Amino acid sequence: ARGQKISKACAACHSFDKGGANGVGPNLWGIVGKAKQGQSGYNYSGALIAHGNPKWEYIDLNEYLYKPKKYAPGTNMNFIGLKKPEDRAAIVAYLRSLSDSPVPLPTDAQIAAEEAKLAPPETEGEGEENSEETSNSDTTDTETSE
């Protein structure tokens, strides 16, 4: 599948086999729904503990794979990220398949909300009725029209 093909770049640091050894990065078998620093025998940086949500939910994997160092400042993962949503979705789907009991898939609404959150900010005005000029910093992450 596409996700498995894309994940070959990850194999330099991660293993994907059930019971597989950790490498430079932790083994990723069963990662979806697992505690963020839950791979025994791997020395994590601590950046993921500081992030909040204790488990690797779909939304967290999507954000982390988009920009790992933005999601978890101080992470040891030296990967710039995957810009294309379809690449992230393929990897996450592949990771989901690496389980004896895969986590249920997200709903279409959850997917749409996450894509809107990660979309680049709009650079032009939103056509607000406010007569005063507002700066781009006044817009929220959810204001997109792409």
Feature map (PLM): residue ranges:
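Short cysteine/histidine-rich zinc-coordinating motifs and their immediately flanking basic loops
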Residues: N22-N27
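Detector for the c-type heme attachment site
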Residues: H14-G20, G33-K34
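Electrostatic cytochrome c docking/interface patches
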Residues: A1-S7
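Flexible coil segments in periplasmic/lumen-exposed cytochrome c-class electron-transfer proteins
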Residues: Y42-I59, E63-Y66, K70-E146
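Short, cysteine/histidine-rich loop/knuckle motifs that typically chelate Zn2+
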Residues: A9-A12
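A short secondary-structure junction motif
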Residues: I31, A35-G38, P68-A72
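Short, flexible micro-motifs
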Residues: I6, L28, K36, M77, ...
